[in-house]
Amino acid sequence: WIAAHLAAASAYAADVVFGPVYPVYPEGTPDWVRAANPMFHDMGWSTPGKTVDFGQSGNTLIRADLVRRLDIRFDPEFGRSGGEDNDFFRRLARRGARLVVTDTAKAWENVPADRVRTGYLLQRMVRTGRIYANLALRGVHGPRRLAFAIDALLKLLVATGGAIAFLPIDRTRAFRLRMKASSNLGKLSALFGARPTAAWS
């Protein structure tokens, strides 16, 4: 695992390498939830070496000397809501760090039973959308902010309509669309001042 991370860092001259984290769902998880795979985040693993602007810290190699030199730290503002890793890597990328993905350094994570509930998963997507919007819209005003709002609204409407249409025939696809709708609802709520809710106490 670590050898795969180091090999990717060398091959792609990367400062940060992200690898996939595969969820291990608990017994009793419905088949349609497993098929929707809501806890898996695809960063383009099928394109190893792809450059990205942000990522998550679940399976990551970071060049420590770069972090020390740039003096970048996690922002405690995101300590309870989550998103501090997303913010951290965005700031690294803005300072010139090279962030890439690899599909060879794989990790697995056991998912607690209470995190495969529909209500939790949809609320998680709302929170994720708020975090994304709060980060993406920092310093953004005027037409670009309006364009972001219109984009989120259109995606919300399309995803909601799709979820309703697919529910009778494809529960997995319908749920994926519900998650997409929830994420865009979170983005819109952030535009009206909503802050990410605490993910833990």
Residue ranges and their predicted role:
Residues G19-P20, R34-D53:
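Short, flexible, basic/aromatic active-site loop/helix in glycosyltransferases
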Residues D53, T60, V100:
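Residues that recognize and position ribonucleotide moieties
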Residues Q56-D71:
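Conserved nucleotide-sugar donor-binding
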Residues D65, D87, K106:
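Active-site phosphate/pyrophosphate-handling residues
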Residues G79-R90:
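Acidic donor-binding loop at a coil-to-helix junction in glycosyltransferase catalytic cores
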Residues Q123-R130, L137, H141-S201:
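Non-catalytic, C-terminal membrane-associated alpha-helical segments of glycosyltransferases
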